[in-house]
Amino acid sequence: MKAEIIAVGTEILTGQIVNTNAQFLSEKLAEIGVDVYFQTAVGDNEVRLLSLLEIASQRSSLVILTGGLGPTEDDLTKQTLAKFLGKALVFDPQAQEKLDIFFTLRPDYARTPNNERQAQIVEGAIPLPNETGLAVGGKLEVDGVTYVVLPGPPSELKPMVLNQLLPKLMTGSKLYSRVLRFFGIGESQLVTILADLIDNQIDPTLAPYAKTGEVTLRLSTKASSQEEANQALDILENQILDCQTFEGISLRDFCYGYGEETSLASIVVEELKRQGKTIAAAESLTAGLFQATVANFSGVSSIFKGGFVTYSLEEKSRMLDIPAKNLEEHGVVSEFTAQKMAEQARSKTQSDFGISLTGVAGPDSLEGHPVGTVFIGLAQDQGTEVIKVNIGGRSRADVRHIAVMHAFNLVRKALLSD
């Protein structure tokens, strides 16, 4: 089924309101296996709406119109659709009864002929009751095309879609999706590696999305059950993860988790809890961002003992007992400093892990290091590891955010290697 969404309302075209209905509808239609091919907005103009309906009827099998069902003169969606289909408007008894009750309970409200229009539907349409408003929606099939009219206010449209429309559109298959999350590889490289799978996809499909510091892949398939979907998605997932980078590294090494809400931080926090281990942090350029991210999760007192924000050389020396002369010799942005910060954070809090971050967030370079240079240390029983990452060409906020992601990834790898 090819679906098309037409938003009716001059206020959308003038930017007075944002068309959030289209996003909501597209998402919900996709969940039941209905593909949306077109989204259009048109003003409150009969001629232009008639023209758009003519186009939509030729290219789509499901045409959904939102907005223009109210009591004002410029609310003309149902009237225009009826004219296009050569049908009359008729009253829906249930919607009329709701109008009667509404005005009976509000004797001070003037009931005008325009109010009555809210209870009308196109002749032959199945009414879609409005749970939170007065304008009734409708669903009608003519010449192989299904037309749907929905109210514009999201508070009225959403329950009508969820409770009235979707059950009437349900087919034997639904859309099932799985999200793979990758860190440490860019979108362009990932897309190049997966070019054959992307270019030749039919069902299941995969779509890459770049976010700050990471890339996600959405795998989707139409199936009649979750079990059937899992079989198809498992095959595609393994095909993806079996691929290698140009350096011969498996994509499995970059895939850290699944789902829309999953993050490197959530993975690390849950794994620390599972293993019963603790962590402390010493931060310079990130100024406590790693620790604040840990604290976003409930129940972290069992795994997070505390930490240090040591922005200046003097505070690194005073709070972490690192000799100032050593810091001056090696520089605050150095492998040495990251190592000592991590080791001292671990030692002073008696934690299983000590993580440190020091570097150049920008906009100016520091100690000869360009913006985006970051050293991250991880101290544990087996010793201390320090990595250097270069996060160039980013804003100050992005450098700090991505540096914290690298820190969580370093801890994640250590936890998985135990």
From Swiss-Prot:
Induction: By competence and damage. Signal peptide: none annotated. InterPro entries: CinA (IPR050101), CinA-like_C (IPR036653), CinA_C (IPR008136), CinA_KH (IPR041424), Competence-induced_CinA (IPR008135), MoaB/Mog-like_dom_sf (IPR036425), MoaB/Mog_dom (IPR001453). Disulfide bonds: none annotated. It comes from the Bacteria. Belongs to the CinA family. NCBIfam families: cinA_nterm (TIGR00200), PncC_domain (TIGR00199), PRK00549.1 (NF001813). This is Putative competence-damage inducible protein. It comes from Streptococcus pneumoniae serotype 4 (strain ATCC BAA-334 / TIGR4). The gene is cinA.
